Regions:
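Single conserved hydrophobic/aromatic residue that forms the stacking wall/gate
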Residues: 253-261
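NAD(P)+-binding Rossmann beta1-loop-alpha1 motif at the extreme N-terminus of oxidoreductases
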Residues: 2-54, 191-192
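Rossmann-like NAD(P)(H) cofactor-binding subdomain of soluble oxidoreductases
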Residues: 23-24, 45-47, 59-132
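Internal alpha-helical scaffold of NAD(P)-dependent oxidoreductase catalytic cores
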Residues: 103-113, 129-167, 178-217
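Aromatic-residue-lined binding/catalytic grooves and analogous aromatic/hydrophobic interfacial grooves
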Residues: 175
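Short acidic capping loops at alpha-helix termini that bridge into adjacent secondary structure
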Residues: 34-37, 88-89, 113, 198
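C-terminal substrate-binding/catalytic lobe of Rossmann-fold NAD(P)-dependent oxidoreductases
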Residues: 155, 193-252
Length: 261
């Protein structure tokens, strides 16, 4: 992101919880002038107040972006208060899980530029992956700027259709929970084999961290990386056989989509 881009844009952040704070921290680190950021939060933290951004103050008349980082259930109550920014040039960027673009258009107006994004929890440390999709009212330039704003919390990808968001939610949105469960399972297994709990957990965490970094940085596909570390008739193969021993080949392949819950 260029300094010029920061200087010519004003932004309102609705909600400054974990994800909102992560984005704000990223924007400020990358050079966004705190004077050009307004934050609406009912319980501002000491950290937020100390950033120098405009907290719960009079809002700008023509913001470039309004980032929606409040809980989905709060949207019907909160968002109508910002409907006067709708049907114009202001772009609404939502990271509220499960809320479709059509729902925002119903609250803000059919001509409102809206971008729906789905980050995941590693965004809290700048290592997230966010998928975004826009309606037809968003210009190419605005979509690119939104991508740069979202890049403050990690990688950004664009979708071809909002229908893909369900798959994104099941994969990268829920994926960290599956990985955390795997870490716990590895640590428990290690403890049951005689390791103390602290050592087992450290081994599990670093194994997943290292494997993830290797998969992300290597030109070798994960399937081949798995094969490379799996000796015939060895302990790794035996463990994989247990993990894959079900009718569908692997339980992860049958994880529920948001449509199933």
């Amino acid at each position: 992101m260029t300094q010029e881009m920061f200087d010519r844009n004003t932004l309102i952040l609705l909600g400054c919880g974990k994800m909102g704070s992560a984005m704000l921290k990223g924007w400020l680190t990358k050079g966004f002038d705190p004077k050009n950021i307004w934050v609406e939060d009912p319980h501002p933290s000491d950290w937020l107040i100390g950033t120098g951004v405009n907290v719960n103050l009079n809002l700008p008349p023509e913001p470039t972006f309004i980032c929606i980082a409040i809980k989905p259930q709060m949207i019907p109550q909160i968002l109508p208060k910002f409907s006067h920014y709708g049907n114009g040039l202001c772009v609404f960027l939502s990271i509220a899980a499960g809320v479709k673009i059509s729902s925002f258009q119903a609250l803000l107006g059919q001509k409102t530029p809206i971008i729906r994004a789905m980050p995941n929890t590693p965004a809290e440390i700048g290592l997230g992956i966010t998928a975004q999709i826009a309606n037809e009212n968003v210009s190419k330039d605005a979509f690119e700027v939104a991508g740069k704003l979202l890049s403050a919390i990690g990688e950004v990808v664009s979708l071809n259709s909002e229908d893909q968001m369900d798959a994104v939610t099941g994969l990268s949105g829920s994926g960290p929970a599956y990985v955390f469960y795997l870490i716990d399972a590895l640590a428990v297994a290690g403890h049951e084999q005689g390791l103390d709990k602290e050592l087992a957990m450290k081994l599990a965490k670093m194994t997943v961290l290292g494997a993830g970094k290797l998969a992300a940085s290597s030109s070798v596909v994960p399937t081949d990386l798995r094969v490379n570390v799996t000796s015939p008739n060895g302990t790794t193969e035996a463990g994989l056989n247990i993990l894959m021993d079900n009718e569908n080949g692997c339980l992860l392949y049958t994880s529920p989509s948001p449509r199933d819950v």
